[in-house]
């Protein structure tokens, strides 16, 4: 997520970036927008997401941050990897 917005009023762009880049550094592709302070009827934050782009990047091995992972789950784009621990007998 790339932080934009005014002081004490954060707004974020959901972006694809190289893991070695800074938080607000070089961006490969912008795939969404997140406003945690937006006033909506249900009291949920405003999220705009390009679902096709998100699925494409996840299929290519992109790893979302914890926050973006939660947003993707809410949009039903991301499913948690199942635990691969064997059952004990």
From Swiss-Prot:
Could you read off the lineage of the organism from its UniProt record? Bacteria, Bacillati, Cyanobacteriota, Cyanophyceae, Gloeobacterales
Q: Which gene encodes it?
A: rpsP
- GO molecular function annotation: structural constituent of ribosome
Annotated GO biological processes are: translation
Extract the Pfam families matched here: Ribosomal_S16
Q: Which InterPro entries match?
A: Ribosomal_bS16 (IPR000307), Ribosomal_bS16_dom_sf (IPR023803)
Source organism: Gloeobacter violaceus (strain ATCC 29082 / PCC 7421)
Keyword Ribonucleoprotein among UniProt keywords = yes
Task: Say if the entry is tagged with keyword Translocase.
Answer: no
Descriptive protein name: Small ribosomal subunit protein bS16
